[in-house]
Design a protein with these regions (language model features):
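GST-like fold's C-terminal all-alpha helical module
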Residues: 2, 105-178
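GST-like domain detector, emphasizing the conserved glutathione-binding G-site
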Residues: 2-134
Length: 178
């Protein structure tokens, strides 16, 4: 419905990763997409597969029809919402809900999603099995607290975060299984 080109987007990622809400947004926008399943949390081989498209070796990676490469879930989702405004997955720059949209997109990405990098592989920050267990416990607690903090600040009554319309953040919340 919103397709501007026949060249598909190429999305690198796996189920449950930051690629999930990007894939949902592309699907809701009816944009052509080729999905390349890659799970960097499964080890060096998988991270190596990402090297050519993302030197940081993380997902999601979205290759635009122009060949340009984008990374970072929030950046991709905001770009898609801005590039395809008719899809209604994010408020227009002049919309009164735009500030909250950007606030919560950034919060989820920086305060919550970033913690999964630690939680998924505690050995990145811990030097012993005991320390890994502590890191895992504390990151899991912090993730839950961030969701509680966000929930406490949500307006009551509207169906979605920004009122009665679906937004990118609603996709993240529902599809990431938080």
């Amino acid at each position: 419905m919103y397709t501007m080109a026949s060249t598909p987007f190429v999305l690198y990622g796996g189920p449950g990763s930051g690629a999930t809400p990007v894939h949902a947004a592309l699907t809701l926008m009816d944009l052509p997409v080729k999905v390349v399943d890659v799970a960097p949390w499964q080890g060096e081989h998988e991270r190596g597969r990402l090297s050519a498209v993302n030197p940081m070796r993380q997902v999601p990676v979205l290759v635009l029809p122009s060949g340009e490469i984008m990374t970072e879930s929030a950046a991709i989702l905001v770009w898609l919402a801005d590039r395809y405004p008719a899809a209604g997955l994010g408020p227009h720059i002049d919309d009164p809900t735009r500030a909250q949209f950007l606030r919560w997109m950034s919060f989820v990405s920086a305060a919550i999603y970033a913690l999964y990098w630690v939680r998924d592989e505690p050995s990145r920050l811990a030097s012993s099995p005991e320390a890994e267990a502590t890191v895992l416990e504390r990151t899991t607690e912090r993730i839950a607290q961030c969701w509680r903090d966000m929930d406490a600040q949500m307006p009551r009554g509207p169906r979605y975060l920004l009122g009665d319309r679906l937004s990118d953040l609603a996709s993240v919340e529902k599809l990431e299984g938080f």
